[in-house]
């Protein structure tokens, strides 16, 4: 294996593969951290020995899963691999920038892990709120390293976003209009626009935090005329679009899979799906303060953010019903990717419903910073984003490698994972309603039952993660041959061979409508 091929690659397929491998490793680190959290919370009493250590693990778990697992896999992995193939482009618009976007991530991950390893670690939560993140409450270099890590990961994402936007706008095959693009390409385009608009705001916020910590500025320090609430506004103006960045590519993946395994040529309501994603992207920018209902906003502001947040349920509902309409009347092929897609639709909807509950500012005053919120966002992330990743991975693995995954093992894996994540996160709704707060390593005895059930679920999920590594090994070592792909006319990525040649196009492409 040529080292130069992987270090200096300008090939979208190789870089996509690097992203997928990196994301898989980061996912295992993130899973290990989550198991430490659940082991600590299995029973009352201390296991890790200090709340600071516990919060360092929680913070690292969040950052690793968001910035080094979900984003690299969905946007970097699936995006790089599939977008050029789906629009008939020979590669990405800026191939070397593409390589740099990837290679900014390993140093970023290293800095993030270093921030946990030195001093007492960055135990701030993934929101990094001052004054807890100030140089008084967090002396030492931990938070500074975490900030630098975020700068690198953010730079990587911004460069990647520029690359995707340019590629999609300029490199489509000549007679392909925007409304001819597959939904996954649309989802990546909208995600890239969200990244480009939101990440600079995060960069500004954490840079001000960095200067507050090291250069005696007082952006977030009331004693010098600053305001810690300003940081919250800056963070969540990034943070809310970020959660849509995490789920939008998943919407695109699920749209493809649902159509494919229902034996349909295309998803139901294509234009509606495009507008729904666009609306979600737009609305995602004007609801950020629903994360801040407890900081003391006046009633008009709370009424606006409650209403605006609930409006997002409309385009989301459009998407869910369009997926169901796509399945309706189709000849369903019950293969693993379709099981993941069904799981996604059901569990993402459950997560969305708890989101509607939390959108009510009056209810959120009570539920804010309880396990109800943890349950909500893990339903949309651990069972939304991750299920979409698994659906995409089991569907396109053959395209990426040329080898099909084992049909039975992948279904067993889905079942194990489905039971594991639901057992982990469903009880957390009850804990939240009973008032158990987030980010504490210990709790009163009354919460023991649901916590121990939740921790048991996390062990089942671990079994599923281990099973996944076995399934990949089994496929790579068995080297089964591939069968022909159906619906070739509307699933362009399969038209090139499995796996496709290193350089897809030797001449200009042309779109022929079926």
Swiss-Prot record:
Protein EC: 7.1.1.9
Binding site for Fe(II)-heme a: 61, 378
Pfam families reported in the protein's UniProt record: COX1
A Gene Ontology BP annotation from the UniProt entry: electron transport coupled proton transport
A molecular-function term among this protein's GO annotations: metal ion binding
Keyword annotations from UniProtKB, A to Z: Calcium, Copper, Electron transport, Heme, Iron, Magnesium, Membrane, Metal-binding, Mitochondrion, Mitochondrion inner membrane, Respiratory chain, Sodium, Translocase, Transmembrane, Transmembrane helix, Transport
Pathway given in the UniProt record: Energy metabolism; oxidative phosphorylation
Residues on Mitochondrial intermembrane side: 41-50, 118-140, 213-227, 287-298, 358-370, 434-446
Sequence positions that bind O2: 244
Cofactor(s) the record lists: heme; Cu cation
Subcellular location: Mitochondrion inner membrane
Binding site for Cu cation: 240, 290-291
Residues annotated for Mg(2+) binding in this entry: 368-369
Domain of life where this protein originates: Eukaryota
Key word Translocase present: yes
SUPFAM superfamilies in the record: Cytochrome c oxidase subunit I-like
Membrane topology category: Multi-pass membrane protein
Transmembrane feature ranges: 12-40, 51-86, 95-117, 141-170, 183-212, 228-261, 270-286, 299-327, 336-357, 371-400, 407-433, 447-478
Cofactor note: Binds 2 heme A groups non-covalently per subunit. Binds a copper B center.
Family of the protein in this entry: Belongs to the heme-copper respiratory oxidase family.
Name by which UniProt lists this protein: Cytochrome c oxidase subunit 1
Native source species: Pelomedusa subrufa
Classification of source organism: Eukaryota, Metazoa, Chordata, Craniata, Vertebrata
Gene designation per UniProt: MT-CO1
């Amino acid at each position: 294996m040529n080292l130069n091929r992987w270090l200096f690659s300008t090939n979208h397929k190789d870089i996509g593969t690097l992203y997928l491998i990196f994301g898989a490793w980061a996912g295992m680190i993130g899973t290990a951290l989550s198991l430490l959290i659940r082991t600590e919370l299995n029973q009352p009493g201390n296991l890790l020995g200090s709340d600071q250590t516990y919060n360092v693990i929680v913070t690292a778990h969040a950052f690793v899963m968001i910035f080094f697992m979900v984003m690299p896999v969905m946007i970097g992995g699936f995006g790089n691999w599939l977008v050029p193939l789906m629009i008939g482009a020979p590669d990405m618009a800026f191939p070397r920038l593409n390589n740099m976007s990837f290679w900014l991530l390993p140093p970023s991950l290293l800095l993030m892990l270093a921030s946990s390893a030195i001093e007492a670690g960055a135990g701030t939560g993934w929101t990094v709120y001052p004054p807890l993140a100030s140089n008084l409450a967090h002396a030492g270099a931990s938070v500074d390293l975490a900030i630098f890590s975020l700068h690198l990961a953010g730079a990587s994402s911004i460069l990647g976003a520029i690359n995707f936007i340019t590629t999609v706008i300029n490199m489509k095959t000549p007679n392909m209009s925007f409304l001819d693009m597959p939904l996954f390409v649309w989802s990546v385009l909208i995600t890239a626009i969200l990244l480009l608009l939101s990440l600079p705001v995060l960069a500004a916020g954490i840079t001000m935090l960095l200067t507050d910590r090291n250069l005696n500025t007082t952006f977030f320090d009331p004693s010098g005329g600053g305001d810690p609430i300003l940081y919250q506004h800056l963070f969540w103006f990034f943070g809310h679009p970020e959660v849509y960045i995490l789920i939008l590519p998943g919407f695109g993946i699920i749209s493809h899979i649902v159509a494919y395994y229902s034996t349909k040529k295309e998803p139901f309501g294509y234009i509606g799906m495009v507008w729904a994603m666009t609306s979600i992207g737009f609305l995602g920018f004007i609801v950020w303060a629903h994360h801040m209902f407890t900081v003391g906003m006046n009633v008009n502001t709370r009424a606006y953010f409650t209403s605006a947040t609930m409006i997002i349920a409309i385009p989301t509902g459009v998407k869910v019903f369009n997926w169901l309409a796509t399945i309706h009347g189709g000849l369903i092929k019950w293969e693993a990717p379709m099981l993941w897609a069904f799981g996604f639709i059901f569990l993402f909807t459950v997560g969305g419903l708890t989101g509607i509950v939390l959108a009510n500012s009056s209810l959120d005053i009570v539920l804010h910073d309880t396990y109800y919120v943890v349950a909500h966002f893990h339903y949309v992330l651990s069972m939304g984003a991750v299920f979409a990743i698994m659906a995409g991975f089991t569907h396109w693995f053959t395209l990426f490698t040329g080898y099909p995954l084992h049909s039975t093992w992948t279904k067993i894996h889905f079942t194990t994972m489905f039971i594991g994540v639901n057992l982990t996160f469903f009880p957390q709704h009850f804990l939240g309603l009973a008032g158990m707060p987030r980010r504490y390593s210990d709790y009163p005895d009354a919460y023991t039952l649901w916590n121990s059930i939740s921790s048991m679920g996390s062990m089942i999920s671990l079994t599923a993660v281990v099973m996944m590594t076995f399934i990949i090994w089994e496929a790579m070592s068995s080297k089964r041959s591939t069968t022909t792909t159906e619906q070739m006319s509307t699933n362009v990525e399969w038209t090139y061979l499995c796996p496709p040649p290193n350089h897809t196009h030797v001449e200009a492409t042309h779109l022929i409508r079926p």
